[in-house]
């Protein structure tokens, strides 16, 4: 008996084809020392699908890695910010400023899909030049099966981790009897973030978790050794905390960061391996923090705004819109050396919502920004339209706008006289601006429906193509991906 064959091709605007695996993935933890030598510390296997990592690089120095087989063929390539570089942004003064610090050593992780051909990883440093650092062979390296499990609180869960951007909080300096304070602090930051556009519009695309890691002592370290401690010179305190956070690092009073990065990665790998964005909240009201591999901030009243500003860097890859220095200058969605209104990258927004071509302050006045009062410049204002647009595009670079589709097989064989159903479960934005249209053999058959039912008797015997196209027609985006 002849049958009709329907091939489903689920096509989405912003779909990105990437290398991945259904066999799980490994989290490899590496250390890079003061001479840029890299060593492998641990590997942990995760039995779930690895989604693409598209977190943006936003500093001038990065580490490029290549996974190769034993024929020296590259099967996977990636790039991360140089983990030794952290930055401190000071919004306490009228004019924000940024200070860069290079750590003596740092830890970082690479999530690698399982591939039986994987043989070695090569590391390169890219900071204007391109220099090979070293290579490490995976052969005979044992997977670390030890786990240290902590409670994980669901702050906001909108779907499976594999189809969401997962924000994970770690707390430092919270004792066991202060975990309710920690969760409350995290909820405050999460609530502030998702009441901020465009995160409020795309809230359903995110999950938020808090790992409850108790410290021996409450608080953090402030040795009062930085020359800029000012009125805090006599305010000396120490605390035995799980991630060893401290002020006064690298002689900057307000530079607050965790010194045991290795422990932080172990906690993440053991308890929430699907993390995409990491926030570390330190239990002190004193102003401070730093950005880098970890976004670290205190319980100061500005912490929520600092966290939202920082996610603009780490998630959306946005530049600061105050002049941070030539180390941070470059071509970004919201920064350019081009001041031609016809060709500038935010041309589609020009002169709407106060979007213009504004020179940075001297000596960076040959670099331009789109707005004069954006959250990437000051704490408090909303993101400008250019930053909103690029944040939305960053969401779609990581995720497809669906939870699931059916049938799961992309090739379906049915008798010529039967009925067959196709459907998708979309991830809706707020307000919903998704359009879901269905096509058979490139002919539109249904508009704005999550599913269709086809009577195969209406089609000739043989092969037909069923296609669903999901598009986001939000007016917050004017430039397609």
List where the protein language model places each region.
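Extracellular glycoprotein-like low-complexity segments
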Residues: 21-148
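Propeptide-to-catalytic entry region of secreted or membrane-anchored zinc metalloproteases
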Residues: 64-86, 144-267
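Exposed beta-strand face motif in extracellular beta-rich ectodomains
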Residues: 117-119, 462-467
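Short pre-active-site segment immediately N-terminal to the catalytic Zn-binding motif
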Residues: 179-182, 287-308
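Catalytic zinc-binding patch centered on the HExxH motif and its immediate surroundings
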Residues: 219-222, 261-297
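Active-site recognition of the HExxH zinc-binding catalytic motif
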Residues: 304-321
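Solvent-exposed segments in extracellular or luminal domains encompassing
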Residues: 450-463
């Amino acid at each position: 008996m002849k049958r009709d064959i329907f091939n489903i091709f689920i096509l989405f605007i912003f779909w990105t084809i990437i290398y991945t695996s259904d066999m799980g993935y490994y989290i490899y933890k590496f250390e890079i020392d003061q001479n840029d030598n890299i060593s492998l510390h641990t590997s942990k296997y995760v039995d779930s699908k690895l989604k693409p990592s598209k977190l943006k690089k936003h500093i001038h120095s990065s580490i490029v890695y290549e996974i190769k087989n034993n024929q020296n063929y590259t099967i996977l390539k990636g790039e991360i910010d140089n983990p030794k570089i952290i930055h401190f942004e000071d919004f306490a003064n009228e004019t924000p400023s940024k200070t860069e610090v290079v750590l003596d050593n740092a830890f970082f992780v690479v999530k690698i899909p399982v591939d039986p051909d994987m043989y070695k990883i090569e590391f390169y440093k890219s900071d204007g030049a391109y220099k090979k650092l070293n290579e490490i062979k995976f052969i005979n390296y044992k997977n670390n099966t030890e786990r240290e499990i902590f409670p994980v609180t669901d702050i906001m869960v909108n779907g499976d981790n594999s189809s969401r951007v997962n924000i994970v909080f770690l707390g430092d300096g919270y004792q066991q009897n202060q975990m309710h304070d920690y969760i409350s602090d995290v909820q405050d930051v999460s609530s502030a973030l998702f009441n901020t556009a465009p995160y409020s519009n795309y809230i359903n695309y995110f999950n938020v978790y808090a790992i409850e890691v108790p410290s021996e002592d409450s608080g953090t370290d402030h040795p009062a050794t930085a020359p800029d401690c000012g009125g805090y010179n006599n305010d000396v305190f120490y605390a035995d905390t799980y991630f060893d956070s401290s002020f006064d690092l690298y002689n900057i009073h307000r530079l607050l960061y965790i010194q045991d990065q290795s422990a932080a990665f172990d906690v993440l790998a053991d308890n929430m391996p699907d993390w995409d964005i990491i926030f570390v909240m330190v239990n002190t009201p004193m102003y401070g923090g730093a950005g880098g591999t970890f976004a670290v901030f205190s319980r100061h009243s500005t912490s929520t705004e600092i966290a939202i500003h920082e996610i603009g860097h780490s998630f959306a890859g946005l530049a600061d819109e105050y002049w941070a220095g030539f180390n941070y200058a470059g071509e970004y969605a919201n920064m350019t050396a081009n001041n031609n209104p016809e060709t500038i990258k935010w041309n589609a927004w020009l002169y709407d919502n106060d979007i213009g071509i504004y020179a940075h302050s001297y000596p960076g006045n040959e670099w331009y920004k789109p707005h004069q009062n954006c959250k990437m410049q000051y704490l408090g204002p909303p993101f400008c339209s250019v930053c909103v647009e690029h944040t939305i595009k960053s969401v779609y670079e990581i995720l497809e706008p669906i939870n699931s589709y059916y049938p799961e097989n992309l090739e379906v064989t049915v008798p010529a006289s039967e009925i067959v159903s196709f459907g998708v479960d979309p991830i809706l934005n707020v307000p919903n601006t998704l359009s879901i249209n269905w096509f058979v053999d490139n002919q539109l058959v249904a508009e704005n429906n999550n599913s269709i039912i086809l009577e195969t008797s209406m089609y000739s015997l043989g092969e037909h193509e069923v296609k669903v196209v999901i598009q986001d027609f939000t007016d917050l985006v004017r430039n397609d991906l």
